Amino acid sequence: MFFINILTLLVPILIAMAFLTLVERKILGYMQLRKGPNIVGPYGILQPFADAMKLFMKEPMRPLTTSMSLFIIAPTLSLTLALSLWVPLPMPHPLINLNLGILFILATSSLSVYSILWSGWASNSKYSLFGALRAVAQTISYEVTMAIILLSVLLMNGSYSLQTLITTQEHMWLLLPAWPMAMMWFISTLAETNRAPFDLTEGESELVSGFNVEYAAGPFALFFMAEYTNIILMNALTTIIFLGPLYYINLPELYSTNFMMEALLLSSTFLWIRASYPRFRYDQLMHLLWKNFLPLTLALCMWHISLPIFTAGVPPYM
């Protein structure tokens, strides 16, 4: 029974990830005044499945000098971590109701750094190693602000469980009282998922394709799937934390519909940003975090810590 539960969680995620690639190509196409994919199936709707068949039927080539085991483990680990992050998300009921759901997400997302580092090192190519080092530095740096923002949210939520965020946001989205943090969180999720304008890991002019430059066929598809699964996950997490969907006990389907619509809108914003903005310079990316975001998030975190202490003597109002 538990296996069926896992399948009912993972299969829709993989289908959503497949169609996100199509939506991205369509949005980029229309923003550049062209059609995008429109040959395979009606309106190009079968394009993701055609791409998947092509990638998984190709022979997985690899350079002779690669470290075989790490070369194969890295993409597998990447997708496994991307899918396991969905376990504690309330939609409205999580697969496993973890008391420390937010900590689980933080810990698991920071493990994804290893798959990037291993893939860059195992490829035995200087381009992929440079791309991997860039990605690791960027991911670790932006995780610092994300952790501090999550800490501030926990103080408002009063629990490490993601489930209680539904109750916390019954009357008002946390986006309204904590909008500066929501803005910084959204930009940090862009950097965390290595999306434009922070896609410095795959700067074509200097790094060819980044840490996955030596990958082809199946292993490359696994990296690709992990990236898009992470995009949907980050937007789902943003929805749960800052845009708590409506929840009626008698009508849980309404929560799921609301949740999906908000996550879809945020994912579309990711694609819109990709079509609109040029890539950052690497030093600007790091300055944005260490000189702007970090002091701001620390100050806001101190504010959220001190607020309950200051208002401890004030009677609650109904």
UniProtKB/Swiss-Prot annotation:
Q: What is its EC number?
A: 7.1.1.2
Signal peptide bounds: none
Transmembrane segment boundaries = 2-22, 70-90, 100-120, 136-156, 171-191, 231-251, 253-273, 293-313
Mainly resides where? Answer: mitochondrion
Q: How does it sit in the membrane?
A: Multi-pass membrane protein
- Where is the protein found, in the record's own terms? Mitochondrion inner membrane
Extract the GO molecular function terms from the UniProt entry. Answer: NADH dehydrogenase (ubiquinone) activity
Q: What is this protein called?
A: NADH-ubiquinone oxidoreductase chain 1
